[in-house]
Curated annotation (Swiss-Prot):
GO terms for cellular component: acetylcholine-gated channel complex; cation channel complex; external side of plasma membrane; membrane; neuron projection; neurotransmitter receptor complex; plasma membrane; plasma membrane raft. Neuronal AChR is a heteropentamer composed of two different types of subunits: alpha and beta. CHRNB2/Beta-2 subunit can be combined to CHRNA2/alpha-2, CHRNA3/alpha-3 or CHRNA4/alpha-4, CHRNA5/alpha-5, CHRNA6/alpha-6 and CHRNB3/beta-3 to give rise to functional receptors. CHRNA2:CHRNB2 and CHRNA4:CHRNB2 nAChR complexes exist in two subtypes: LS (low agonist sensitivity) with a (CHRNA2/4)3:(CHRNB2)2 and HS (high agonist sensitivity) with a (CHRNA2/4)2:(CHRNB2)3 stoichiometry; the subtypes differ in their subunit binding interfaces which are involved in ligand binding. It comes from Homo sapiens. Keywords: Cell membrane, Disease variant, Disulfide bond, Epilepsy, Glycoprotein, Ion channel, Ion transport, Ligand-gated ion channel, Membrane, Receptor, Signal, Synapse, Transmembrane, Transmembrane helix, Transport. It is linked to Epilepsy, nocturnal frontal lobe, 3: An autosomal dominant focal epilepsy characterized by nocturnal seizures with hyperkinetic automatisms and poorly organized stereotyped movements. This is Neuronal acetylcholine receptor subunit beta-2. Activated by a myriad of ligands such as acetylcholine, cytisine, nicotine, choline and epibatidine. Channel potentiation by calcium is stoichiometry-selective, CHRNA4:CHRNB2 nACh receptor is achieved by calcium association with topographically distinct sites framed by anionic residues within the CHRNA4 subunit and between the CHRNA4 and CHRNB2 subunits. Oligomeric amyloid-beta protein 42 activates specifially CHRNA7:CHRNB2 nAchRs. nAChR activity is inhibited by the antagonist alpha-conotoxins BuIA, PnIA, PnIC, GID and MII, small disulfide-constrained peptides from cone snails. Changing residue 287 to M: In ENFL3; approximately 10-fold increase in acetylcholine sensitivity. Residues 261-265, 322-458 are cytoplasmic.
Length: 502
């Protein structure tokens, strides 16, 4: 019986020993907390200083957990940060050997004195941290407090290079009620921590430098400022905004290549202009309504709208020239020289003047007229009263050749002329009238074709000008942000005026 009870007693003794040790450890921590927070020796409303002139040094460091958003239009940056604060409280000290070598204890932060460090440039009225976590207190009185916070801070948005922009959003921390004669804020690290940072899909973190600011005119002022230097990832705006704008603008190039007879020049121009206006309205809803600067995309849209407006004006001029005729306008000699001879060669254009059948006939007729081959179509017989006339074979052949027809054989003996009836004079006059009328119409058509060719040359000239300005203007605008030297020094030393004391 004694042998059976021995193992059971051993197990019961071991269990009681563990229970007593756990209760003993819990009792030790409870005794320590009661000792530290005893109202007779500790008051959380009093600054932990032995005298009024002693400074309480508070070490501060920001750990960025997440860059939630940057609202450009409202100029607000929302961040999830952990605000590390360390200081010493001589009242929260103990001897570890008196409390089972317990060197650290966690105390509710609302039961101890806290430096009232708040975000000064807050944008929504939430100056405090989101959650009052426990503070870790060491036996030597050093306190480590790491509360999480979601801050909405005011951020001045620079829209000059949007969407290839880089922003500098600052977060200024300062004690709300204590000044430099009571609390000395010190940077724990020169840069904010990114150990627990979750990458953002819209922004890249360039640098997170911190600095301690003092006011030489006010010896009681001190604050800790962190510069959040962030660069936008432009892929989203490039795909959804810039590339469609470039493609729509390239459609305006086709306006100058479109024939004037089709009647769609003005329709295409106005359609492109309306599409660009829609994109301009989208931009106005994204960027802040500031008059200090114009965003890069806005500049490009205005640039393209000016080009499209220019294409509308030139299309009106081209259509006006295209529909000119000899009855309304006379072509000046310098117009013929410039637009029919000089510019076509420079624009790599070649007028098919010598390859058209009508043009070949026109040139042959003019050559015959210069040679005098058709000077006289008929000649009268001797005697004014005679009704006899003679057909001039050479004149008939010359006139036929002038119009590109084979001369008909003339019956009769091999003389130069033969007598004919008196009614032939009237027939010859009618033929002469028809020939003169056809010659006049042919000349008018030639002038009209010259005006159309002048319009074509003007169209081609403006086409090259538009392509040149559009391509080089686009490249020059969107390469401009790449040549900007974004350095941390530029942001840190730009317009940092001395802050005013509270």
């Amino acid at each position: 019986m004694a042998r059976r009870c021995g193992p059971v007693a051993l197990l019961l003794g071991f269990g009681l020993l563990r229970l007593c040790s756990g209760v003993w450890g819990t009792d030790t921590e409870e005794r320590l907390v009661e000792h530290l927070l005893d109202p007779s020796r500790y008051n959380k409303l009093i600054r932990p200083a032995t005298n009024g002139s002693e400074l309480v040094t508070v070490q501060l460091m920001v750990s960025l957990a997440q860059l939630i958003s940057v609202h450009e239009r409202e100029q607000i940056m929302t961040t999830n940060v952990w605000l590390t604060q360390e200081w010493e409280d001589y009242r929260l000290t103990w001897k570890p050997e008196e409390f089972d070598n317990m060197k650290k204890v966690r105390l509710p932060s609302k039961h101890i004195w806290l430096p009232d460090v708040v975000l000064y440039n807050n944008a929504d009225g939430m100056y405090e941290v989101s959650f009052y976590s426990n503070a870790v207190v060491s036996y030597d009185g050093s306190i480590f407090w790491l509360p999480p916070a979601i801050y909405k801070s005011a951020c001045k948005i620079e829209v000059k290079h949007f969407p290839f922009d880089q922003q500098n959003c600052t977060m200024k921390f300062r004690s709300w009620t204590y000044d430099r004669t009571e609390i000395d804020l010190v940077l724990k690290s020169e840069v904010a921590s990114l150990d627990d940072f979750t990458p953002s899909g819209e922004w890249d973190i360039v640098a997170l430098p911190g600095r301690r600011n003092e006011n030489p005119d006010d010896s009681t002022y001190v604050d800790i400022t962190y510069d959040f230097i962030i660069r936008r990832k432009p892929l989203f705006y490039t795909i959804n905004l810039i590339i469609p704008c470039v493609l729509i603008t390239s459609l305006a190039i086709l306006v100058f290549y479109l024939p004037s007879d089709c009647g769609e020049k003005m329709t295409l121009c106005i359609s492109v202009l309306l599409a660009l206006t829609v994109f301009l309205l989208l931009i106005s809803k994204i960027v802040p309504p500031t008059s200090l600067d114009v965003p890069l995309v806005g500049k490009y849209l205005m640039f393209t709208m000016v080009l499209v407006t220019f294409s509308i004006v030139t299309s009106v001029c081209v259509l006006n020239v295209h529909h000119r005729s000899p009855t309304t306008h006379t072509m000046a000699p310098w117009v013929k020289v410039v637009f029919l001879e000089k510019l076509p060669a420079l624009l790599f254009m070649q007028q098919p003047r010598h390859h058209c059948a009508r043009q070949r006939l026109r040139l042959r007729r003019r050559q015959r007229e210069r040679e005098g081959a058709g000077a006289l179509f008929f000649r009268e017989a001797p005697g004014a009263d005679s009704c006899t006339c003679f057909v001039n074979r050479a004149s008939v052949q010359g006139l036929a050749g002038a119009f590109g027809a084979e001369p008909a054989p003339v019956a009769g003996p091999g003389r130069s002329g033969e007598p004919c009836g008196c009614g032939l004079r009237e027939a010859v006059d009618g033929v002469r009238f028809i020939a003169d009328h056809m010659r006049s119409e042919d000349d008018d058509q030639s002038v009209s074709e010259d005006w159309k060719y002048v319009a074509m040359v003007i169209d081609r000239l403006f086409l090259w000008i538009f392509v040149f300005v559009c391509v080089f203007g686009t490249i020059g605008m969107f390469l401009q942000p790449l040549f900007q030297n974004y350095t941390t020094t530029t942001f840190l030393h730009s317009d940092h005026s001395a802050p005013s004391s509270k």
